[in-house]
UniProtKB/Swiss-Prot annotation:
Keywords, comma-separated and alphabetical: GTP-binding, Nucleotide-binding, Repeat, Ribosome biogenesis
InterPro entries, per the entry: AAA+_ATPase (IPR003593), G_ENGA (IPR031166), GTP-bd (IPR006073), GTPase_Der (IPR016484), KH_dom-like (IPR032859), KH_dom-like_a/b (IPR015946), P-loop_NTPase (IPR027417), Small_GTP-bd (IPR005225)
An example molecular function term from Gene Ontology annotations: ATP hydrolysis activity
UniProt source species: Paraburkholderia xenovorans (strain LB400)
EngA-type G domain mapped to chain residues: 3-167, 180-353
Coiled-coil blocks: none
Chain sites annotated for binding GTP 1: 9-16, 56-60, 119-122
Gene Ontology process terms (BP): ribosome biogenesis
Protein name per its UniProtKB record: GTPase Der
Length: 445
């Protein structure tokens, strides 16, 4: 599982600046899709081969008793409790504040590794910057500049060494034995535990493990139609005998960890409730992570035909950025629609892992350009020459040519749809990257 790093500190110490620096590489991968809802408090970072999740907790007032500050404090405490590492940020320019002491008092009790980070330290001597903060009792402060990047890489590498220590690595045989890893996500009371029980069946549970650490997730291995699958707990499930029950507390952090760990995500919605902002946030994170996706609309049984039509229209309008995914209208309680849902899981996984040969990709690109040329930008018309695959899960198609920075988002979507149609890539996000030739004589060759 990807470790979770919580950024904690009083308001205006630079948490959002550090968050943006740590996650910017991920943000750059995803174009703004129409209707896509993002929650800017959660993101993914990567240092070398080590990915991690980052939570920006907002301004933390640990003694707040009511109002929005109290709610922010509650959310921060939950994020800290579910994190692997806490980065406690203080302001090197303004020095030690009473709020810093209150936060430090709280953090010393949470039982997590704490990295005390003094931000805005650019141009200052370390001894001067650090002096005030030793009295917090959290070890040696680390001086950084989130705005300029000074010291950030060293600090995050040190944090990841601690976070990854002792995490077992699965080999290829172990991954194959697990089969397709599925995360069932959704807000409370949509029927996640009911669907899990319908999928797994009481006698089909091969293994159930609930480790004591917050980092580890519950894996439920099962077979369906002779194929191995692994369900990843996202709800915080409790086992009563042979039946799984949902714990009502909704954990954003665990949901994001499970999405990151999955091969395919089933986003479960409640047909009897409106699509919420929380639903859209979860869906947006699935897209940003590039995960294969199937949408299950639960509690479909017994709905009036007019309500069904209205629900379908609502889904199409509010989740239009999920147009690559299959929607299934099911009843987990009645076990209806589950077979087709699982077939779409298999199809989405196959699409996410598809191998796309360079000759076929290039042929599809040439056919698409012949059917519809990209628009000129001034005197320049982009020239698309060839394409190759740059990755899987999600599929990445790299297109080479000239003046490709003039390609519009509309034309990019057109190419995506052509590639999807040609290679039957349903159920997975698709990334398209453009690489222009830097040779000024390339057009004359």
């Amino acid at each position: 599982m990807k470790p979770v790093i919580a950024l904690v500190g009083r308001p205006n110490v630079g948490k959002s600046t550090l968050f943006n620096r740590l996650t910017r590489s991920r943000d750059a991968l995803v174009a703004d899709l129409p209707g896509l809802t993002r929650d800017r408090h959660y993101g993914e970072g990567r240092t070398g081969e080590r990915p991690y999740l980052v939570v920006d907790t907002g301004g933390f007032e640990p003694v707040a008793k009511d109002g929005i500050l109290h709610e922010m404090a509650r959310q921060t405490r939950q994020a800290v409790e579910e994190s692997d590492i806490v980065v406690f940020i203080v302001d090197g320019r303004n020095g030690l504040a009473p709020q810093d002491k209150s936060i430090a008092d709280y953090l010393r009790k949470v039982g997590r590794p704490i990295f005390l980070v003094v931000n805005k330290a650019e141009g200052m001597k370390y001894s001067t910057v650090a002096a005030d903060f030793y009295e917090l009792g959290l070890g040696d402060p680390r001086a950084i500049s989130a705005a300029h990047g000074d010291g950030v890489t060293e600090m995050i590498n040190e944090a990841l060494e601690v976070a990854y220590a002792g995490q077992p690595e699965e080999n290829d045989d172990e991954k194959a034995a697990r089969g397709v890893k599925i995360a069932i996500v959704g807000r409370p009371n949509v029927g996640k535990s009911t669907l899990i029980n319908a999928l797994v069946g009481e006698e089909r549970v091969i293994a159930f493990d609930m480790p004591g650490t917050t980092r580890d997730s519950i894996y439920v291995d099962f077979e369906r139609g002779g194929k191995p699958y692994t369900l990843i707990d996202t709800a915080g499930l409790r086992r009563r005998g042979k039946v799984f029950e949902a714990i009502e507390k909704f954990s954003v952090v665990k949901t994001l960890q499970s999405i990151s760990d999955a091969n395919v995500v089933i986003l479960l919605l409640d047909a009897r409730q409106d699509i919420s902002e929380q639903d859209a946030h979860i869906a947006g994170f699935v897209v940003e992570q590039g995960r294969a996706l199937v949408v299950g609309v639960n509690k479909w049984d017994g709905l009036d035909p007019h309500v069904r039509e209205r629900t379908k229209a609502d889904l199409e309008r509010k989740l239009k950025f999920l147009d690559f995914a299959k929607f299934h209208f099911i009843s987990a309680a009645e076990k209806t629609g589950i077979g087709p849902l699982m077939r779409s899981v298999d199809d989405a996984y196959a699409a996410a892992m598809a191998k796309l040969p360079t000759p076929k990709l290039t042929r599809a690109l040439i056919d698409a350009v012949e059917f519809q040329q990209p628009r000129r930008r001034g005197p320049v018309r982009p020239k698309l020459r060839y394409a190759h695959q740059g990755g899987q899960n999600p599929p990445i198609i790299v297109i080479h040519g000239n003046a490709l920075d003039a390609i519009t988002e509309t034309y990019k979507r057109y190419l995506e749809n052509r590639f999807r149609e040609t290679f039957k890539l349903t159920g997975t996000p698709l990334r398209i990257e453009f690489r222009s030739s830097t040779n000024p004589y390339a057009d004359k060759a």
